A protein has these predicted regions:
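Short solvent-exposed coil/turn linkers within tandem alpha-helical repeat scaffolds
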Residues: 175-180, 266, 306
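Structural microenvironment flanking redox-active thiols in thiol-disulfide oxidoreductases
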Residues: 369-407, 420-426
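Structured, charged N-terminal subsegments at the starts of enzyme catalytic cores
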Residues: 206-273
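A non-transmembrane, solvent-exposed segment enriched in polar/low-complexity residues
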Residues: 20-177, 184-215
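N-proximal helix/coil linker or "cap" segments that precede and/or mark the start of modular domains
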Residues: 282-338, 348-349, 400, 404
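Thiol/disulfide oxidoreductase modules built on the thioredoxin-like
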Residues: 411, 421-462
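Short active-site neighborhood of thiol/selenol oxidoreductases, capturing the structured segment around
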Residues: 345-374, 387-389
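Bacterial Sec-dependent N-terminal signal peptides
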Residues: 1-29, 466, 470
């Protein structure tokens, strides 16, 4: 096979051209901006991260460049010291372009050279920016207006402007359906609901079910080009926090579904797995620690979540193992205790419709603040089948001081006990006080870590709910 000199020269220059076009090169000119540095940041999750900071060149421009292409997403040019940001799109195909604007009006005078995607993006933003103030004004007027002809007129005007925006949007997305700009813009859109029939309660339920079903219509979980936009995180967290039934089983299934979709992308999988692991490590809602245990067992112990710190991984796994026997729905660990008279008994031997176990200490500030509420709770619930068991968490030599504190403050009416060997401490993972567990007759945990101020209200609701479900 013969290769001519001309062909070799062509191949050489073609290869150099390809190499020259590899990576990214974004040149920025901001008229009136004379600061030494300009920063390029990107979205990921619910935060922005700095990609690079460059110095002003001799020509007054700022050039961001690198041999490895940028991952697609919404990036932000950040001016100092005001931290004013200018958003721009970076797609897989457009990594080399120029940006021009003015410091005094960075958004109004924003122009792009060599980036069709950003031209489309700005076209959409300008249109929406023009109509949004009008929509906001009409919505405010509609909200303030009393029922009548005036309100109906405002409603019609609102519908007309909204219809104009929607028509433009749908046409924009249709014409530019293959563009990255259209993908990003669509991901920012809220769900539009059909009209639902039925009672107000039925309409609310249908709306919620529709939102859950269509949550990822505009933000497909497998569309990883949207990872570096704020819309991806918003869709994922809205689905879990607002559109799932807030019960551990439902949340576990929902997070499993999300992570399964994200598996092909290691960065996304690790980020959201760790995000939810942290969220449910210290949940705000009682019983949701079961989600943490599930995630730790399913993804951490199996090695699917990659943590750079082995010690942290081991600690989280250990925490899950300690929490698992204490989850709501589990039978409370049986423990041997001694009452103030020296009589030994087992927790499971207590005969009562409900047992409230409080592990406390006389020198614990939080316990001291909570004790009056425990007393009030006991007085109101002692005749409703609730037994209060207070377990003093102190060494044997301090028990006399503990009992004196009980007597001096009038807390002796309910059952008090101790275990100088601290055998309960491991079983109930006592690393701080107070610890609170509500159990039913069979000593199944039905509530835990109930704050003293809300104890009467929460336990009354639990008891009432259990009565209805019988």
């Amino acid at each position: 096979m013969k290769i001519t000199l001309t062909a070799l020269v062509f191949l050489c220059f073609h290869t150099l051209g390809v190499l020259a076009n590899a990576g990214y090169n974004i040149k920025v000119n901001i008229e009136g901006y004379r600061e030494r540095k300009l920063t390029l940041a990107y979205y990921f999750g619910n935060q922005q991260y700095i990609k690079d900071t460059v110095k002003m060149g001799a020509d007054g421009a700022y050039t961001f460049s690198g041999q490895t292409p940028l991952l697609p997403g919404i990036y932000t040019l950040v001016m100092t010291p005001t931290n004013v940001g200018i958003d721009l799109l970076v797609s897989e195909k457009e990594q080399q372009f120029s940006v021009q604007t003015k410091k005094a009006s960075p958004h109004a005078d924003l122009k792009f050279i060599g980036s069709k995607e950003n031209e489309l993006f700005q076209q959409y933003i300008h249109f929406v920016s023009k109509h949004n103030p009008q929509l906001d004004t009409l919505r405010a007027q509609y909200k303030r207006s009393a029922e009548g002809p005036k309100k109906e007129k405002i409603k019609q005007a609102l519908q007309k402007v909204d219809s104009t925006v929607q028509q433009y949007l749908q046409e924009f997305l249709r014409v530019n359906k293959d563009s990255y700009a259209a993908l990003v813009i669509k991901s920012s859109l809220s769900i539009r609901y059909p009209s639902f029939s039925g009672t107000d309660e039925e309409k609310v339920l249908k709306t919620w079910l529709y939102a859950r079903k269509h949550c990822f219509d505009n933000v497909p979980l497998t569309e990883f080009r949207l990872l570096r936009t704020p819309h991806f995180y918003q869709a994922v967290t809205t689905y879990v926090n607002e559109l799932l039934f807030q019960h551990p089983d439902s949340i576990n299934a929902g997070i499993d579904y999300i992570l399964n979709q994200l598996r092909p992308n290691r960065e996304a999988f690790d980020y959201y797995a760790i995000h939810f692991l942290r969220q449910y490590l210290q949940p705000k809602v009682m019983g949701m620690d079961a989600v943490f245990v599930h995630l730790a067992e399913t993804y951490l112990e199996t090695g699917e979540i990659q943590l750079s710190n082995p010690a942290q991984k081991a600690k989280l796994i250990q925490m899950a193992q300690k929490l698992k026997p204490l989850l709501i729905g589990k039978i409370a660990p049986n423990i041997a205790l001694t009452d103030r008279a020296g009589k030994t008994f087992n927790l499971h031997d207590l005969e009562s419709e409900y047992t409230l176990l409080v592990i406390w200490a006389y020198d614990c500030g939080h316990c001291k603040q909570s004790a009056p509420f425990w007393k009030s709770f006991y007085e109101k619930f002692k005749d409703k089948g609730v037994k209060l068991l207070a377990l003093c968490h102190v060494p044997e030599k301090e028990l006399p001081t503990c009992w004196k504190y009980v007597d001096d403050n009038g807390y002796g009416a309910w059952l008090h006990a101790a275990d100088p060997l601290f055998r309960y401490a491991k079983a109930y993972n006592v690393e701080s006080t107070p610890q609170v567990y509500l159990m039913d007759r069979k000593k199944v945990i039905i509530g835990k870590q109930i704050v003293a101020e809300k104890m009467e209200e929460v336990i009354a609701q639990i008891i009432e709910l259990r009565k209805k479900n019988k």
